[in-house]
Amino acid sequence: MSSNFEPLLTDLIPGASHWSMVIPKGHTLRLKDVEGGANLSVLFYNPKNLLERYNAPDTLKCQHTFKLTTGNCLYSDMGRVFASIVRDDTGWIDTVTGVANKKKVADKWGDRDYQHERNHWKQNGYDALLVEVAKYGLGQRDIAANLNLFTKVSTDIEGMMHYTPEHSKAGDIIELRIEMDTLVVFTTCPHPMNPATDYPYKPVEVSVAKAAPMQEDDVCLNSRPENRRGFENNRRYHFTADLLTH
């Protein structure tokens, strides 16, 4: 957790919106649920090689978990750590249920109509991510399985998935320590399993600050032996990159 968090940048992502930024390694990304009940769908890419992106199966498999929370790392498909979860007030981050598409949102909340609703339209998470990644030359084939921050989806003994309404409370914070230069892509569109009667517009505040150097007793480094190997992959990647730039 960042005890002396001094933001270099702060922004507010309105509900039903999308946002992205390349965040350099050595920074902490703080995400705050402003009103409670937010959902923040997230994708990660290597801005220097956009073919490298967040890999959900490897992230879960190597850490032997279905959920993510404080102490977990977020892996690329090259076995490197994009980010470490150093704070999670919610205790559970959804990893498997993805985003809603146009039909899902229309069936649940009605057709979107930008002509009349403008920026208060009923956008869906899939199209929102597509719009944002297109800014970097990416498209449909580049939309991988995403995370849903501030959202909890659990399973029962028979394997049925259950959405927890209002899992995140107003003011809840999740902090990600960025371990390599990372393109972060967000959308605040509602979760596909959200049972709300009316389309929920829930904003999320984003802040970026310098991160303290990782110590040997770091919770993310030590939560799984596999994470040590992930950080070693990062070290070798940055070692090679530094050689090539000198």
Model region roles, listed by residue range:
Residues 1-246:
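Intrinsically disordered, low-complexity segments enriched in small/polar residues
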